[in-house]
């Protein structure tokens, strides 16, 4: 017996079963497991290594993340390849997996339009910073390295998350540091975490957050003025909101 094939079959069988041949039911056996849509979100966003995926989904245990990745591979949604150095692997979407893009985008659009999102229970400064790293217009930067220091106020009590971090920006790439990288800081961002999340989601204009003193920028004047234009915001920031009579419109 092929043990590798048997292992893949066992992973598929571990998924929830609806007992129906309907294509929606069968697809949900793969897609609707807890955490799976979020894992797919990260793969679509460009995370390919285990630690990269886990960094943006810190509440999933590492064993459960490993299990979900095995299940997705067994279902033909992703493929994994060993890295040249070490024992870690890279995960990439297959053609089958890439077809989930429309479903993931539709979930994000629905969530942006119809749900109340920013509250103390779902604030996550780490996810916010990783998204800012991904969605910064590097081509708008000056032709040198720019260092932006973020310090967040209003971090919910009892939550373990970043309160200070550094965004390292260059035209060739960007990174987030959770400890002082030792570079001279060009722009300081002192922000209320909820306000910064609302700016990112398109619910609060950056200039209005500054006017309300929820975000304060200091540093090199020319870079401070340019900083808001570097932020591309969430992919879903332009999704139209519901009519005012709907509860989700009361933000």
Q: Where do the PLM segments sit?
A:
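Basic, amphipathic "hinge/linker" alpha-helix immediately C-terminal to the N-terminal HTH DNA-binding motif
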Residues: 32, 84-106
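C-terminal interaction segments
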Residues: 182-251
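Low-complexity, glycine/alanine/valine/leucine- and proline-rich hydrophobic stretches
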Residues: 149-207
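Acidic, aliphatic-rich amphipathic alpha-helical segments
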Residues: 96-174, 221-251
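Basic amphipathic alpha-helical segments that dock to polyanions
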Residues: 65, 69-75
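N-terminal helix-turn-helix DNA-binding core of bacterial DNA-binding proteins
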Residues: 22-60
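Short, intrinsically disordered or compositionally biased N-terminal tails of bacterial proteins
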Residues: 1-15
């Amino acid at each position: 017996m092929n043990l590798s094939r048997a292992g893949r079959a066992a992973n598929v069988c571990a998924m929830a079963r609806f007992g129906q041949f309907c294509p929606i039911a069968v697809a949900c056996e793969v897609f609707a497991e807890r955490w799976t849509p979020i894992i797919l979100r990260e793969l679509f966003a460009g995370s390919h290594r285990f630690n990269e995926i886990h960094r943006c989904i810190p509440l999933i245990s590492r064993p459960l993340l490993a299990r979900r990745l095995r299940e997705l591979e067994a279902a033909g949604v992703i493929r994994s390849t060993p890295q040249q150095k070490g024992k870690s692997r890279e995960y990439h979407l297959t053609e089958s997996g890439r077809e989930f893009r429309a479903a993931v985008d539709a979930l994000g659009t629905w969530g942006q339009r119809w749900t109340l999102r920013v509250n103390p229970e779902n604030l996550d400064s780490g996810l916010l910073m990783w998204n800012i790293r991904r969605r910064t217009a590097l081509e708008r930067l000056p032709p040198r390295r720019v260092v932006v220091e973020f310090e967040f106020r209003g971090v919910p009590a009892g939550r373990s998350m970043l309160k200070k971090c550094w965004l390292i920006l260059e035209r060739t790439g960007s990174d987030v540091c959770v400890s002082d990288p030792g570079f001279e800081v060009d722009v300081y961002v002192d922000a209320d975490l909820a306000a910064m999340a609302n700016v990112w989601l398109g619910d609060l204009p950056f200039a209005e957050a500054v006017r309300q003193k929820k975000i304060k920028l200091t540093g090199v004047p020319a870079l401070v003025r340019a900083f808001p234009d570097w932020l591309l915001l969430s992919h879903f920031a332009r999704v139209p909101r519901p009519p005012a009579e709907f509860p989700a419109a009361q933000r």
